[in-house]
Amino acid sequence: MSETATWQPSASIPNLLKRAAIMTEIRRFFADRGVLEVETPCMSQATVTDIHLVPFETRFVGPGHSQGMNLWLMTSPEYHMKRLLVAGCGPIFQLCRSFRNEEMGRHHNPEFTMLEWYRPHYDMYRLMNEVDDLLQQVLDCAPAESLSYQQAFQRYLEIDPLSADKAQLREAAAKLDLSNVADEEEDRDTLLQLLFTFGVEPNIGKEKPTFVYHFPASQASLAQISTEDHRVAERFEVYYKGIELANGFHELTDAREQEQRFEQDNRKRAARGLPQHPIDHNLIEALKVGMPDCSGVALGVDRLVMLALGAERLSDVIAFSVDRA
């Protein structure tokens, strides 16, 4: 394929046929388990507050909004799906487009396909088992292994991430030749993420998928704090062959705590000179009504297909990557 022929698909037709078969297989997986497929908006008047996510913003100027109404493309369908859970829909899944105004590269495209699902009355471990079932079915891989965030740091960096101070984290970063970044960083969680990215991720999931669970409580996001160890959150991530595939939570159901976390995110944004984002008060109001205890996970479908096909880049399994869109 000529590099100048940008009208052509970035993926081959055989790869697109295989991708379609995988999408059918995913839907069958959930249909067989009685999980309802849903569709939620791609745009919202509110967005994520996470300091590490950059959403796309647009403006609606239709009838009744001559002054314009700010809308955000969804980075994930999470907030709307949780409102459906509160409304009583039961277990649900969604295959949808998500958007993040971030990097483009081998494993990234600003527009991508997300698989997200929620299981009322599942704890984190039961959902991890279901994710493992899906990966084995789609990838024909071995059963996954699991280790805690603390175990991962102790095994590969010889440091305890739950007790180490910033000086110790910078010392660990120096061993990875990351002092030029770490020495200027004051946020402890950013230091931990730096160490995880460069010191842990390259070592896990080489032969089989690997679940890393019980992230620090300070990185809980929308997950519950463990009742057994308040230092950690009921959150997990899945890695395979150098790729982060999924991020899951035992979901937070406390409306007040969730609102406080959103507000804390915005304070962190302000401290970093980042724009503060509108909080999704519809989600907060729904949580006040009461969301069933549940666990949920978001999985990158393009990355899953890339692994299933043995492709080198996301663009090999997407009809038109952003540079050809």
Swiss-Prot record:
HAMAP family membership: EF_P_modif_A
Reactions it catalyzes: D-beta-lysine + L-lysyl-[protein] + ATP = N(6)-((3R)-3,6-diaminohexanoyl)-L-lysyl-[protein] + AMP + diphosphate + H(+)
Top-tier EC class: ligase
Role, per record: With EpmB is involved in the beta-lysylation step of the post-translational modification of translation elongation factor P (EF-P) on 'Lys-34'. Catalyzes the ATP-dependent activation of (R)-beta-lysine produced by EpmB, forming a lysyl-adenylate, from which the beta-lysyl moiety is then transferred to the epsilon-amino group of EF-P 'Lys-34'.
List of residues binding ATP: 100-102, 109, 244-245, 300
Keyword Zinc-finger: no
Domain of life: Bacteria
Protein name as it appears in the record: Elongation factor P--(R)-beta-lysine ligase
Keywords associated with the record: ATP-binding, Ligase, Nucleotide-binding
Enzyme Commission identifier(s): 6.3.2.-
GO CC, alphabetical: cytosol
Organism lineage: Bacteria, Pseudomonadati, Pseudomonadota, Gammaproteobacteria, Enterobacterales
Binding residues annotated for substrate, in chain numbering: 76-78, 118, 251
Stated family: Belongs to the class-II aminoacyl-tRNA synthetase family. EpmA subfamily.
SUPFAM superfamilies referenced in this protein's UniProt entry, alphabetically: Class II aaRS and biotin synthetases
InterPro entries membership: Aa-tRNA-synt_II (IPR004364), aa-tRNA-synth_II (IPR006195), aa-tRNA-synth_II/BPL/LPL (IPR045864), EpmA (IPR004525), Lys-tRNA-synth_II_C (IPR018149)
BP GO terms, sorted: lysyl-tRNA aminoacylation
Assembly mode: Homodimer.
Gene Ontology MF annotations: acid-ammonia (or amide) ligase activity; ATP binding; lysine-tRNA ligase activity; tRNA binding
